[in-house]
Amino acid sequence: MGRMASPLRSKSSAPRVESTRHKETSTVRVETSSHREETSSHRVETSSRQVRTSSRQVETSQRHREGPSLTPSTKRLPQFLEVSSQHVETSSQCTETSSRHVRASSSLRVETTVHRVESPARQSARMAR
């Protein structure tokens, strides 16, 4: 019976190595998902910058129109431009809040997934030792 016990032990140790390999692949998947979330947050930042540049363009157009303020028609135009600049400012604030929301959600998701993957990996390391 002593000869039959030795091959059973070798078979039981084999699945443990396979389980550790599967956990390693899962950690790589978590890293790729975190990088994707980072790229999406960068895209939101670029869109907010574009809105800021457009608001600056509106301000420059106001100065050009306000310069020759001799005719009544040019006095009516700056009021319309002021309303448009306010609309651009509110839209830029909305994009800033959305970028902050993306950063908060991405950091929380990555932390929770990493902790879940690390806990079984440490247990397998203790079992191997």
Swiss-Prot record:
Biased composition (Low complexity): 47-59
Basic and acidic residues: compositionally biased ranges: 18-46
Stretches for region Disordered: 1-129
Biased segments, Polar residues type: 70-97
Superkingdom of origin organism: Eukaryota
Name of the protein: Uncharacterized protein C17orf100 homolog
Lineage: Eukaryota, Metazoa, Chordata, Craniata, Vertebrata
